Amino acid sequence: MKKKMRLKVLLASTATALLLLSGCQSNQTDQTVATYSGGKVTESSFYKELKQSPTTKTMLANMLIYRALNHAYGKSVSTKTVNDAYDSYKQQYGENFDAFLSQNGFSRSSFKESLRTNFLSEVALKKLKKVSESQLKAAWKTYQPKVTVQHILTSDEDTAKQVISDLAAGKDFAMLAKTDSIDTATKDNGGKISFELNNKTLDATFKDAAYKLKNGDYTQTPVKVTDGYEVIKMINHPAKGTFTSSKKALTASVYAKWSRDSSIMQRVISQVLKNQHVTIKDKDLADALDSYKKLATTN
């Protein structure tokens, strides 16, 4: 089961060049960037042209957001946390990892920076927005505890049906996962994954089928998902428990839901920018953060 990409692209390289060139404007000499038979391109002319690019303001905004988040909460996100997430994607995509980066507009370093931005944003969310008792009670109504399953993802329905027949004949699920699953991220550990009902990286049909199973049971018919067909076996389906004992899990589920809400996260980022006193000095780029400033005034 492949994770769905949910990352905000940080195009910082051009923004970095923009700021570096901006700094050069304070120098008395206008350095030459390039020459041609009819003349030359100076830093000032290049900087002026660069500012006309429709994506420049977006890139500058992304760069400032990252720096503001990192200054405010950088100590809360370790290098190990980022590297572990990076390695998880690298393992998931295997030999296709570089293609994955290219398709999403990343270099290896910018991908790590994007991952770090996501973690920093989550820290900011928890620092700036607290979960109320009424919100916990609302979450409790639909709450389901984390479950652990084994799964086998196949590219076609016939293979999934054969897996189910093999299980009925007594074959081991973990061995079948290794030989028949096309999910390279889980096939070698028996197809085992743990998740909660609010997990948005998994197909709804997958979660619905899994939560109907009791411990030890497996799906009797293939489950259609985006990437193919699934056979699912329930390993651990705990009881829901009580509201009081589940508060920690409920809080985590509310934050997970909020982190996927773009309007909430925009408000959080706008507050971070306000708290960090972010100001753009160049009048041609001054409105790059206007959408966040407007949100900050209504928070």
Curated annotation (Swiss-Prot):
A lipid is attached at residue 24 (S-diacylglycerol cysteine). It comes from Lactococcus lactis subsp. cremoris (strain SK11). Its main location: membrane. The gene is prsA. InterPro entries: Foldase_PrsA (IPR023059), PPIase_dom_sf (IPR046357), PPIase_PpiC (IPR000297), PPIase_PpiC_CS (IPR023058), PrsA_foldase (IPR050245), Trigger_fact/SurA_dom_sf (IPR027304). Residues 1-23 form the signal peptide. A lipid is attached at residue 24 (N-palmitoyl cysteine). Keywords: Cell membrane, Isomerase, Lipoprotein, Membrane, Palmitate, Plasmid, Rotamase, Signal. This protein is essential for production of active forms of the serine proteinase located in or secreted from the cell envelope. NCBIfam families: PRK04405.1. It is a lipid-anchor. One of its GO terms (molecular function) is peptidyl-prolyl cis-trans isomerase activity. It comes from the Bacteria. It is found in: Cell membrane. SUPFAM superfamilies: FKBP-like, Triger factor/SurA peptide-binding domain-like. This is Foldase protein PrsA. Its EC number is 5.2.1.8. It catalyses: [protein]-peptidylproline (omega=180) = [protein]-peptidylproline (omega=0). Residues 144-236 form the PpiC domain. GO terms for cellular component: plasma membrane. Belongs to the PrsA family. One of its GO terms (biological process) is protein folding. It is an enzyme of class 5 (isomerase).
